[in-house]
């Protein structure tokens, strides 16, 4: 009987590990439920190639200025946000209380009202953008090609070529930005500032989740399963080494008691940045990570002030 119980427990453990890895190897694609028009903003649909040719889709929201904010999004989300309030998209996040909608439309409204042009796009494998990198998520180590593609696209448009640029890089989008700055710093030469809600190391995410699941010793199994499923190394998706390339004025934001990671991770990312002008804003009073994504839409002051200081 003990052998049967042990076999069942092993099967359950293996299934849980497989489920965690499948979120990266076979990412769900959530729908784009809103558009800038919902907030009265004129916009056009755009598409452009990533650095490796993957087709990236997005919105361009024009303004009468020489300033441009380029925005991307968290993992499993898209340029609109994330429909976590709807099944099946919120199911995986229910246990942590994150089965709520993330809505980035107010971000774009606040930025436009402050005089910024906006280019918002979907990372590969999300939203309307094409599949790339074998259809797997790289937590930034593949998606950096999309970030560079967005910068090259802005420079390719005559009316945007001389724009003062800021980046609104959220979660995986900030990871991708940091990886891009590490690999191709020359592509970021005219970026003046970054606002970055909640970058995250994948090992910190997995380690925290495994702790909640009562499997704190399973991280090596997850790393092995991830390697087998995606040909990527978990250690390569830890962000502090890439943060060492961030010498641009950067504002980080993070839910301090985030149930899906630890404050030590974002603190290590922040500490590794050599930027002379940098700040870390802790979001208090919640343990829901997705409240961190909704913070700037509801409290735009820090974002508008940061871009105002460094972009103009």
Predicted regions and their residues:
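Short beta-strand/loop motif that positions the catalytic acidic residue
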Residues: 245-247, 252-254, 258
């Amino acid at each position: 009987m003990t052998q049967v119980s042990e076999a069942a427990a092993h099967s359950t453990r293996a299934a849980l590990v497989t489920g965690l890895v499948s979120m990266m190897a076979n990412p769900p694609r959530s729908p784009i439920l809103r558009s800038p028009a919902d907030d009265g903003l004129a916009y056009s649909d755009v598409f452009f190639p990533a650095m490796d040719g993957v087709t990236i889709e997005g919105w361009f929201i024009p303004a009468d200025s020489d300033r441009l904010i380029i925005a991307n999004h968290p993992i499993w989300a898209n340029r609109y946000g994330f429909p976590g309030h709807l099944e099946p998209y919120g199911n995986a996040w229910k246990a942590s209380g994150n089965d709520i909608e993330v809505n980035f439309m107010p971000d774009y409204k606040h930025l436009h009202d402050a005089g910024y042009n906006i280019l918002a796009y979907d990372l590969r494998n999300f939203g309307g953008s094409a599949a790339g990198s074998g259809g797997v998520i790289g937590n930034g180590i593949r998606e950096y090609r999309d970030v560079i593609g967005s910068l090259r696209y802005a420079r390719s448009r005559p009316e945007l070529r001389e724009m003062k640029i800021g980046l609104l890089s959220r979660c995986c989008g900030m990871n991708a930005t940091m990886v891009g700055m590490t690999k191709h710093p020359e592509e970021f030469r005219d970026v003046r500032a970054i606002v970055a809600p909640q970058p995250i190391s994948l090992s910190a995410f997995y380690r925290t989740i495994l702790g909640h699941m009562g499997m704190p010793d399973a991280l090596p199994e997850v790393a092995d399963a991830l390697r087998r499923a995606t040909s990527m190394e978990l250690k390569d998706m830890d962000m502090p080494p890439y943060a060492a390339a961030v010498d641009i004025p950067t504002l980080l934001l993070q839910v301090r008691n985030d149930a899906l990671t630890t404050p030590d991770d974002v603190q290590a990312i922040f500490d590794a940045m050599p930027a002379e002008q940098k700040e870390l804003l802790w979001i208090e009073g919640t343990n829901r990570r997705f409240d961190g994504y909704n913070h700037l839409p509801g409290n735009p002051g820090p974002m508008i002030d940061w871009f105002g200081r460094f972009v103009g």
